UniProtKB/Swiss-Prot annotation:
Oligomeric and partner information: Homohexamer. Organized in a ring with a central cavity.
Broadest EC class assigned to this enzyme: hydrolase
Protein name (Swiss-Prot/TrEMBL): Lon protease
GO MF annotation terms: ATP binding; ATP hydrolysis activity; ATP-dependent peptidase activity; sequence-specific DNA binding; serine-type endopeptidase activity
Lineage: Bacteria, Pseudomonadati, Pseudomonadota, Alphaproteobacteria, Hyphomicrobiales
Amino acid sequence: MESFAPTRKGRAVFSADAAATAAPGSAGAGETLDPAKDALIIVPVRGFVLFPGIVMPVVLNGPAAIAAAQEAVRQQRSVGILMQRESGAEEASPLNMHRFGVVANILRYITAQDGGHHLICQGEQRFHVEEFLRERPYLAARVKRIEEPDERSPDIEARFVHLQGQASEALQLLPQTPPELIAAVNSAPSPGALTDLVAAYMDASPAQKQDILETIDLRARMDMVAKLLAQRIEVLRLSQEIGRQTKASLDERQREMLLREQMASIQRQLGEGDGKAQEIAELTEAIAKAKMPAEVEEAARKELRRLERMPDASAEYGMIRTYIDWLIELPWSLPEEAPIDIAEARRILDADHFGLDKIKQRIVEYLAVRKLAPQGKAPILCFVGPPGVGKTSLGQSIARAMGRKFVRVSLGGVHDEAEIRGHRRTYVGALPGNIIQAIRKAGARNCVMMLDEIDKMGASAHGDPGSAMLEVLDPEQNSTFRDNYLAVPFDLSRVVFIATANMLDTVPGPLRDRMEIIALTGYTDREKLEIARRYLVRRQLEANGLKPDQVEIDDDALIEIIRGYTREAGVRNLEREIGRVLRHVAVRIADGSASHVHVSRAELTELLGQQRFEDEVAMRLSVPGVATGLAWTPVGGDILFIEATRAPGHGKLTLTGQLGEVMRESVQAALSLIKSRAAELGVDPESFDKTDIHVHVPAGATPKDGPSAGVAMFIALVSILTGRLVRNDTAMTGEISLRGLVLPVGGIKEKVVAAARAGLTRVLLPARNRRDYDEIPQDTREKLEFVWLEKVDDAMAAAFEGMAATPAPN
């Protein structure tokens, strides 16, 4: 059967008479139901319950509801308003319909201009569905109509009076209650009618209203409505109380503002008290403009009220004023962030730093992630490396690339937790901690904060600042960081934290676990030369008031400064020495003795004095018992001389040079290995009991430790016991085992760079360190010959290659 379609569009009202005169062949007209069989046309509704005696608009959803309503209008019949069990169901079917509904008369059928269909219905009587007779094109069912009981017993009357009182109270609590509704409640003809009236207009869920409709017993129904109405009255009372309090608060604030204005006007006329009143007014305005969170603003206004009541001469007046100033001046709101330009970030990093390709690539990756996920929790980078390699300047470059403010917090020597969290205001001279002070200095809540020298914090009786830093660097906690001085939470989650350290040994494990470690190694001589050309000379020219056309420094002179006057992993001393050279030049130009100065290698002795570092390798390796090891230090790699000598004695082993426990064990392991191979090496096994051996590692004032010198110890001992010289162009590193294996060690890049810097041409490295070969700079690889060691036999073959045996000195 086709669905009903009106023949005239835009018609707003269908009456029963008009529908009756519709064309008999209209689509949707089905066979007429027999009223005698209690057959009822069902209009399905969603999320709506109609009660007997109530006139309500009914929204027609879906073709079944529209067809049912139009057929009922055509036949001039009542309909059954029945709610669907699932309001989200598209099609009405017997399976998703409730079984209790209300018989209703259609007072009006409305077709709106937007195409919607509505009925104005008046509920008449409850019914129960006994059987659905049809499903398409509309629902029809055989129903049992339920008569409303007319009881007037005392308990019913008592409930009636109670419910009527509740309804009147609820209507009084509601704003703008229609008078007709009040009159309907007061003139309800019966307890059942009152109950249905209250249920219809009560703020309850459709499910609760359906339960009321299905409750046939009048007492139970009245109790159910009374209970729900009592809950609603309580909600209305609370809402009204909250509204009164809010209005009272606003009225009090307006009254206070008016009184203050009047007081200020009187004071201005008298010429008294202008200063403090103006100060309070300025602070009030500043608090309003600071865009503080509600909790912080409440704390600020509370302190402002205390300040207003306090005499100016009070000692506490200045403390409160300082506290309010801190709250006002902190950046509580988040500024707009410019998008990160990755290409511009690369340009900035390349312009500010030479080399460091892998470090810069990691920073670019970090910035790319920040760009794509600005709300994400980015890792906290920690740059670890020797002094002067550019850790702090990398942080400044990151800030420039992100377009953010940069601020630096020095943690070196901090040993008090209050330096991080601040002092409580009860102490004289209390201030916030370094973190909050840095935020205020930056003036932005999304700044880049450099935590410099994080490895140099120390615990004391005043607490452990390292533990306080755990909260600062934890993305899960720092959004509510609470400084002891402020005593209110401050959001640090948008701060980009970057830490620096020279070494990780002194950084607590939990703190180290919160950071991503990025190691910066020392520069090669070629890299230092390029850095001097591009940055250091230019910076020192500007610092000393010189112009580029007044001074020219040869590359040979710069190389000589690098090798003879500075021996460091970074370039800090190199810049200092270049500054010394240019100050000498500035004197010549300032006194008029020269207008252009050319600095060559030959002039360095005159300008800087004698070289501070000399090549001692050849001299030290001129006797047996001396081997050159390679060491890693916090300031980069270095060469390490191992000296051994022997003398008649009783088999005593002496170790000097401030050797650590691991290094001492390396010497003992090397000597035990030699004893086990004495026959192979040509050493008399009985000579060990008649010989005292002394191993020394200069410089004696510097503590040394680690397993890296095992190979060098072994070669030095073999050299002194066999009288063979070690090649003077060879350095070595590696740990040894009692089986004669050479084990891998760390710091290969720094050690190899140190060997090249010292003028050596061969390095002996553990074969299992081949994976570190790619980390070595290309220019350093080109200068050196690499020998890879599996066993100590490989080390002896390479160290003694081409060297003759000479009598070992006694």
